[in-house]
């Protein structure tokens, strides 16, 4: 019998989706999931709005921006919900190009971002600020998704960018340097699963089942049940050699940077996102965000959903 079909937009190929499929969780949930790579966060949310995508893996800052702030790249808000928290950044790090010997050399050079008004960009700006570099000390250039920025960094198109999800490991193996991580800023939520609000159970049901399947897969990884499967998928999907694949597995298991095993979105990490926006993109609308953000969470993200 054909399962419910879902199209999910991702920046970097998702090990969780891949392993949920290979372990049979998607089949048991009655789901056929197609993963579609997206070039940037504006493109991702534009496709979500038009119905080209049903679900996205994205930064929670994107959800805050597109739900509450009309001054987002689309120019209007969307009724988007967080279905589950996925990870805490997966090694989100400030990285330097092979030719850049230190942070001082970033001065007057290009810092690559997805788009300037985005959560990962704010992390880059904050980590550079901690190193003594302000916004007038470098040029900001939109280079798109994390894999695209990793390629640009390795090629020397930009001097610095933030990378994660195995991209930082592949870049380091190509001669790039990791100089700081998002943990230097505070508790962080790197990826969530999100979708447009859906009151119709025929639409909401498959999305919620996908969130549950991914959460359960994350739990299996963290408890050590899928070690070899993770290493194989890291090589096949992310292009990581064995040492980098093992480092990525360690990152998935790490409590500071790794997977979230219950889907819960915590207040401290959301506050970090809001504080970063206040510093790097101040807006009076952020006062509303600070009080209204729980309204974007579904039961699993609130930590109240049913568990199997």
Where are these regions (language model features)?
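Conserved C-terminal helix/tail region of periplasmic/extracytoplasmic solute-binding proteins
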Residues: 274-308
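A structural preference for short, hydrophobic beta-strand core positions in alpha/beta folds
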Residues: 35, 140-142
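Short, glycine-/small- and polar/acidic-enriched structural segments
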Residues: 2-133, 159-165, 179, 187
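Pocket-lining segment of extracytoplasmic ligand-binding domains
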Residues: 71, 148, 154-237
């Amino acid at each position: 019998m054909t399962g419910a079909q879902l199209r999910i937009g991702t920046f970097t190929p998702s090990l969780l989706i891949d392993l949920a499929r290979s372990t049979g969780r998607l089949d048991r949930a009655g789901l056929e999931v197609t993963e579609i790579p997206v070039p940037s966060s504006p493109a991702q949310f534009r496709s979500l709005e038009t119905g080209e995508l049903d679900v996205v893996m994205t930064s929670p800052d994107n959800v805050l921006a597109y739900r509450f702030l009309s001054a987002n790249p689309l120019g209007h808000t969307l009724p988007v919900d967080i279905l589950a928290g996925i990870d805490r950044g997966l090694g989100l790090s400030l990285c330097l190009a092979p030719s850049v010997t230190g942070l001082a050399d970033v001065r007057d050079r290009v810092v690559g971002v997805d788009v300037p008004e985005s959560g990962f960009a704010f992390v880059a700006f904050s980590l550079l600020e901690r190193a003594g570099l302000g916004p007038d000390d470098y040029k900001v250039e939109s280079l798109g998704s994390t894999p695209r920025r990793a390629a640009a960094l390795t090629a020397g198109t930009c001097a610095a960018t933030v990378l994660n999800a195995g991209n930082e490991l592949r870049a380091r193996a190509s001669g790039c340097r990791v100089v700081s991580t998002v943990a230097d800023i505070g508790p962080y939520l790197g990826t969530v699963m999100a979708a447009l609000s859906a009151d119709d159970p025929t639409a909401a049901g498959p999305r919620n089942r996908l969130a549950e399947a991914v959460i359960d897969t994350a739990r299996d990884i963290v408890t050590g049940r899928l070690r070899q499967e993770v290493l194989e998928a890291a090589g096949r999907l992310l292009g990581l050699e064995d040492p980098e694949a093992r480092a990525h597995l360690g990152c998935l298991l790490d409590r500071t940077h790794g997977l979230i095993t219950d889907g819960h979105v915590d207040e401290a990490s959301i506050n970090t996102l809001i504080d970063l926006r206040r510093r790097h993109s101040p807006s009076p609308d952020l006062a509303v965000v600070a009080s209204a953000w729980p309204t974007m969470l579904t039961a699993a993200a609130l930590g109240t959903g049913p568990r199997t």
